[in-house]
């Protein structure tokens, strides 16, 4: 179980890093959209698509690890959310804290990307 949690933490950190890259591209796009620089917009969009593909790949890894954790804990994977896993880790405070930090960072990064993308629309 410990290795599954370590794996989940690592995957969440990887996903956070990918979202941070996506956020940077989204922020870079704003002035490019305003200046109507279509070549630069195309370049940034191509790089964004690469990062989105990476995020999809990482998300599949996270889903698999979550499924493995659900199997070990004899729980329904569809009801096992990250917040639930964090709560269940109360007896392992170090892992719980690492998971919570990764979850919060991921949640914040996703929210920032959504906000910038709304502005760019």
Regions found by a protein language model. Give the residues of each.
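Short terminal interaction segments
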Residues: 80-121
């Amino acid at each position: 179980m410990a290795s599954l949690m370590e794996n989940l933490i690592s995957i969440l950190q990887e996903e956070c890093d990918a979202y941070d890259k996506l956020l940077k591209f989204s922020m870079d796009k704003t002035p490019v959209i305003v200046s109507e620089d279509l070549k630069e917009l195309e370049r940034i969009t191509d790089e964004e698509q690469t990062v989105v593909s990476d995020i999809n790949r990482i998300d599949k890894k996270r889903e698999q690890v979550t499924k493995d954790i659900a199997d070990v804990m004899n729980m329904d994977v569809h009801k096992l959310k990250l917040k639930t896993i964090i709560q269940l880790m109360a007896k392992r405070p170090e892992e719980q804290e690492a998971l919570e930090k990764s979850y919060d960072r991921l949640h914040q990064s996703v929210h920032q990307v959504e906000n910038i993308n709304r502005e760019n629309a």
